[in-house]
From Swiss-Prot:
Lineage of producing organism: Eukaryota, Sar, Rhizaria, Cercozoa, Chlorarachniophyceae
Membrane-spanning parts: 26-42
Protein name: Cytochrome b559 subunit beta
UniProt topology in membrane: Single-pass membrane protein
PROSITE patterns hit by this protein: CYTOCHROME_B559 (PS00537)
Binding annotation for heme: H30
Sequence similarity: Belongs to the PsbE/PsbF family.
Gene from which the chain derives: psbF
Cited HAMAP family: PSII_PsbF (MF_00643)
Compartment list: Plastid, Chloroplast thylakoid membrane
Keywords of the record: Chloroplast, Electron transport, Heme, Iron, Membrane, Metal-binding, Photosynthesis, Photosystem II, Plastid, Thylakoid, Transmembrane, Transmembrane helix, Transport
Role: This b-type cytochrome is tightly associated with the reaction center of photosystem II (PSII). PSII is a light-driven water:plastoquinone oxidoreductase that uses light energy to abstract electrons from H(2)O, generating O(2) and a proton gradient subsequently used for ATP formation. It consists of a core antenna complex that captures photons, and an electron transfer chain that converts photonic excitation into a charge separation.
Length: 51
């Protein structure tokens, strides 16, 4: 087998990669983003409270 044939075999035998949805990065981003959006929304809504 030549180098070219080996390269073609490696490309043809590649299986699709399945990535997990919930990774540590996903959890870290959402652990910060969800409360941030909540607090920004609550602070914004407080601006419209009438006495």
């Amino acid at each position: 087998m030549t180098i070219k044939n080996k390269t073609i075999n490696l490309i043809e035998n590649k299986k699709p990669v399945v990535y997990p949805i919930f990774t540590f990065r996903w959890l870290a981003v959402h652990a910060l983003a969800v409360p941030t959006v909540f607090f920004i929304g609550s602070i914004t809504s407080m601006q419209f409270i009438q006495r």
